[in-house]
Each structure stands twice: as C-alpha cells, then as structure tokens.
Amino acid sequence: MDPDTVKSTLSNLAFGNVLAAAARDYKKEVLANEKAQGSRPVNEEVDLDELMDDPELEKLHADRIAALRREVEKREAFKRQGHGEYREVSEGDFLGEVTRSEKVICHFYHKEFYRCKIMDKHLKTLAPRHVDTKFIKMDAENAPFFVTKLAIKTLPCVILFSKGIAMDRLVGFQDLGAKDDFSTTKLENLLVKKGMLSEKRKEEDEEDYEYQESIRRSVRSSANVDSDSD
C-alpha cells in the first residue's frame, strides 16, 4: 500500500465506531440534562441519521478522531522503542533498553524454572495491553554482571525500572499469594499499584478494541482493492 493510501485510510479510520461512541456520549449528556432539570427521562434510541448534521456532535466526532490519532501516533512511537511486545534482550543491550524508556519491566528468568514460565505467560499477555510500559526479559545465566549488580538471589525476579532506576521488584510469587495459579489480572493490578502500569477502564478497552479492529478492516479492505486492481 502506498503512503498516500495509508494516509487516506488513517484519515477515515473508525468513522462508524467513533460516531456511534459519540452518539452514546451525546445521549448520556441529554439524559443527564433531563434528569438535572427534573424532566421525563428520554428512552428513545438516538437516531444517527438525525444527529449527522448536529454541529455539537460533529465537533465531538472531530475531537474524538483527533484524540484517537494522537493515541495511534503515541503508540507507534512507543513501538519504535520496543514497546507493545514481550522481548528477550541480551546483557549487552540491557542498559540501553532500560534507559531509553520511562517505565520498564524486566523479568530475570531461568529457562528450566517452572515459575519463570508462568511469569512469562502473564507478562506476554500484559505487554500489548500496556504499550506505554516496556516489557523485556533476560536469561539470568547469561547476565551474570547484572544479576550480581542488582543482587538477584531468587527467580523469577521482576525488576521495575523508572527512568533507568530500579525502583522495586517482585521476587518469586510472594506478592501474588505465593501460589502458581494467580491470574493475569492480579499481576496487572499489582503493577498498577506500584505505578508501572496505567489503570485501564473497561470503556477504554472496548473503544480501543473497536478502533483497532476498524484499522485492521480498513487496511484489509485497501489491500483487497489493490489486489483487485492488479
């Protein structure tokens, strides 16, 4: 796909989903105003066709599109720094990885330790959900200098870095109920509490999912058009 096509696709991303979300917001505002004024609640569904020419809704739509574009640009910038996936790094790359990003979660592991594999599974799940935090891992056997420097005695050991400084750590599963069957949500909440992850609301997850799905559909559609034209 050529750059102009990509730019055009991005400019029209998620119109249907965003407009529907804007309509929901608009309806909530109407209901809130009705309630505040002591009027009868409005139960009718919002007609999107009637709202299309509403200047307030158009502004709301434009603001939402602009916010989503900024979010996409921010995500892309994070991904260029290695965010959005759970990656293995070498000892030689370690310092660069933890100093180039504001928040970094690094799992020091041993490939034969069962509990390290459990931690791997959870961190791999969290990495794409929290793009503003970098998730990496390093084989403790191949990183003797940093294992000693960071005084790592027990594995798994998850070191939490903020602006290149080791601020906290998770040693084994002692902060996770000392059980192997803890949930990803439990780990996520712990990392939120420690300031390493941003708390995500359910609405944000749903809108983000819809938006990303619309991106994929738009790209697939453009790709099919290109294929047909060939």
UniProtKB/Swiss-Prot annotation:
Nucleus listed as a keyword: yes
Chief location of this protein within or outside the cell: cytoplasm
Tissue and organ expression note: Expressed in roots, cotyledons, leaves, stems and flowers.
The entry's keywords: Cytoplasm, Microtubule, Nucleus
Localization, UniProt: Cytoplasm; Nucleus
GO biological processes: cortical microtubule organization; cytokinesis by cell plate formation
A Gene Ontology molecular function term of the record: beta-tubulin binding
Gene: PLP3B
Pfam family, one: Thioredoxin
Biological role: Tubulin-binding protein involved in microtubule formation.
Disruption phenotype: No visible phenotype under normal growth conditions, but plants with reduced levels of both PLP3A and PLP3B show defects in cytokinesis, cortical microtubule array formation, oriented cell growth, and maintenance of proper ploidy.
Ranges of compositional bias, category Polar residues: 220-230
Subunit structure: Interacts with TUBB2, TUBB3, TUBB4 and TUBB5.
Keyword Nucleus: yes
Name under which the protein is recorded: Thioredoxin domain-containing protein PLP3B
Domain of life: Eukaryota
PANTHER family: THIOREDOXIN DOMAIN-CONTAINING PROTEIN 9 (PTHR21148)
Domain Thioredoxin: 89-173
One Gene Ontology CC term in the entry: nucleus
Native source species: Arabidopsis thaliana (Mouse-ear cress)
Family (UniProt): Belongs to the phosducin family.
